[in-house]
Amino acid sequence: MAKQIKFGEEARRALERGVNQLADTVKVTLGPKGRNVVLDKKFGSPMITNDGVTIAKEIELEDPFENMGAQLVKEVATKTNDVAGDGTTTATLLAQAIIREGLKNVAAGANPMLLKKGIAKAVDAAVEGIKEISQKVKGKEDIARVASISANDEVIGELIADAMEKVTNDGVITVEEAKTMGTNLEIVEGMQFDRGYVSPYMVTDTEKMEAVLDEPYILITDKKISNIQDILPLLEQIVQQGKKLVIIAEDVEGEALATLLVNKLRGTFTCVAVKAPGFGDRRKAMLEDIAILTGGQVITSDLGLELKDTTVEQLGRARQVKVQKENTIIVDGAGDPKEIQKRIASIKSQIEETTSDFDREKLQERLAKLAGGVAVIQVGAATETEMKEKKLRIEDALAATKAAVEEGIVAGGGTALVNVIPKVAKVLDTVSGDEKTGVQIILRALEEPVRQIAENAGLEGSVIVEKVKASEPGIGFDAYNEKYVNMIEAGIVDPAKVTRSALQNAASVASMVLTTESVVADIPEKETSGGPGGAGMGGMY
């Protein structure tokens, strides 16, 4: 296919036009007085959002050269979202500022490769500065502040802080769409997996259609149980002790299932059978998790263990097991805490080593089930459009709080970036020529978030930037109340990881744009007009 090529200044200007179209669309959402953007969807109602990465993903431009510029900045937003989960608008804005300032200098004859070196040195100094001023997250209040700022909503902030407190940092918090108007939090204590009872005749509470067994024994196996003779010796031991039994197996069917149900209906013996969670290797790992949590053993041929030889000592124990139609919850397993900690450490190391996002997500779920529990935030609103917008904000806020726990918090509202300017300025003494210009480009870009937040609030950005620069470190501009405050004391905070990732990703892509000398794109095909209409077939109505 034939290509069209642009060179030098013309190529860079085309990329810049694309960058500006995307960044100008995204940057109106920044800050407490930022506006929303409406995205047209081919199906269903339009989507209203102020999430930078969601907006960026929707943008495709007609001109192929401009579109390349837009796609490059889209990568800044996506990468920042992947690493930190928030700060995508800030990252896009910083990339635009670095590209704008950089291209001015390239047009004036600066060497792009030296500019790139200067930019890299300045960014390293800024990242060091951010690490130095970051503060550890202390308790629930700090988490609520981070989440409130990210979601622009104090109620959501409190909700996320509650969830984080209940399920600990290793727990999993999921966001689901609710059927009701309100947004609420549901905590699942203990280990939950998505398999329910094999037969509804096993329920102990017919009103709620669930089986609740207190202090039961738990048989964990990867075998299929169809012959009652296999487990008869074990059942006799349990009946003698007057205990209840939960069976977690590949399946329970035929004669074995019938016998268990008859005994349950007669009231001689209570037993609930549940299919094992997961598939393949993941099933084996999850059964092992359950065994460690409950202090039992997985009865599997891999270890040479047979069902008919199983004794009560090989079974797991728990304070309570609750089995619903599609879920099973094991509360307070009787496993050895040291063994559980070992298992948690092993899963954590697997999370660090894996390269697959899917595997990582599944490992995180397993970790949460062993370590803390699962919290579900049910998002409700009057309309579907509002609910989707709210769900996006909650997901962003969740990611921001996790980032804050990892690397601490810094003053929000773009203040932290202005506060590291003196540290970056020291780099000027160590460089010269075009490298020095590269450092100055970053010094100018670091002011951009404060300037944009002020402009979105209808104020003159430059005046506010100068006042923040002249103030003590940590003093910033509260755009919501339009006054200068100590940002951390006022609860206006950003996760250090979000601020750092935004700057690093913006500088990385912007440097690529500055060092571009030619761009190559396909020549758009001219659409041919349709062929002549065919004559109708006779005799057809």
From Swiss-Prot:
EC number(s) per entry: 5.6.1.7
The lineage's top-level taxon is Bacteria
Keyword Transferase in annotation: no
Gene Ontology, cellular component aspect: cytoplasm
Zinc-finger found in the keyword field: no
**Which top class of enzyme applies to this chain?**
isomerase
Q: Where does this one sit in the cell?
A: Cytoplasm
Pfam families hit by this protein: Cpn60_TCP1
User: What GO molecular functions are on record for this protein?
Assistant: ATP binding; ATP-dependent protein folding chaperone; isomerase activity; unfolded protein binding
Keyword terms: ATP-binding, Chaperone, Cytoplasm, Isomerase, Nucleotide-binding
The residues that the entry says bind ATP are: 29-32, 86-90, 413, 494
Q: Which reaction does it catalyse?
A: ATP + H2O + a folded polypeptide = ADP + phosphate + an unfolded polypeptide
Q: Name one GO biological process term.
A: protein refolding
PANTHER family attached to this UniProt entry: 60 KDA HEAT SHOCK PROTEIN, MITOCHONDRIAL
Give the family this protein belongs to, as stated in its UniProt record.
Belongs to the chaperonin (HSP60) family.
Please give the subunit comment from the record. Forms a cylinder of 14 subunits composed of two heptameric rings stacked back-to-back. Interacts with the co-chaperonin GroES.
- What is its biological role? Together with its co-chaperonin GroES, plays an essential role in assisting protein folding. The GroEL-GroES system forms a nano-cage that allows encapsulation of the non-native substrate proteins and provides a physical environment optimized to promote and accelerate protein folding.
Q: Output this protein's name.
A: Chaperonin GroEL
Q: What is the native source organism of this protein? A: Acetivibrio thermocellus (strain ATCC 27405 / DSM 1237 / JCM 9322 / NBRC 103400 / NCIMB 10682 / NRRL B-4536 / VPI 7372) (Clostridium thermocellum)
